[in-house]
């Protein structure tokens, strides 16, 4: 978890730096990720072996940089330190590129600004029922009345799928749609004239809350982490929190 959070924070920091330099303009209200790829932090959770390789490689690079720094400050014994740094880089257990990097979009690192409030979830439910239920189904299981007519059957949104994607990339898919490998559209996008950015975030909040509830109903456990909705609580003393 610490490795995942550290790598994600590093990417967020790089984006903030580029935004400050004017190299990452605002897109949908937040700084854009300006690169075609990003570090696939979600793979660190899925593949423990890959996570170990990433951690060990980072340690090797860190020790190699330390050896080079010491060699610069030292007048003696520079060559052994250089050889040590080179050996660490050469023999580091580098992770496979296709596991380390994944294609990115401008909103990949965007984070929901809604606060996951109860009101926002209710608003998102209304948006879903108006714009999404025909394809994804009333229970979000991908079996809506129009699903069979699509080029690709809609996914079941009641499982762990939403936790395997970054919020910003889910936002992009709702806003801009999806295409199959052959370029054919598999899901239409909803432009700014159809849904506001706030509505897109709210429907994603609703889907996550709904999926968590469905998994709890089926398994009796919270299989995936979900935030507690921000709600006002009225205590017996009449105080609101």
Where are the regions that the model predicts?
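Sequence context surrounding c-type heme c attachment/ligation sites in exported
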Residues: 121-133, 165-169, 194-197
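Gly/Gly-Pro-rich "capping" loops immediately C-terminal to redox-active cysteine motifs
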Residues: 125, 137, 141-172
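Axial heme c-ligation environment in periplasmic c-type cytochrome domains
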Residues: 148-155, 175-201, 210
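Electrostatic cytochrome c docking/interface patches
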Residues: 104-127
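Membrane-embedded alpha-helical segments of integral membrane proteins
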Residues: 29-71
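Internal/C-terminal transmembrane anchor helices
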Residues: 77-102, 128
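The canonical Cys-X-X-Cys-His
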Residues: 124-139, 187, 203-207
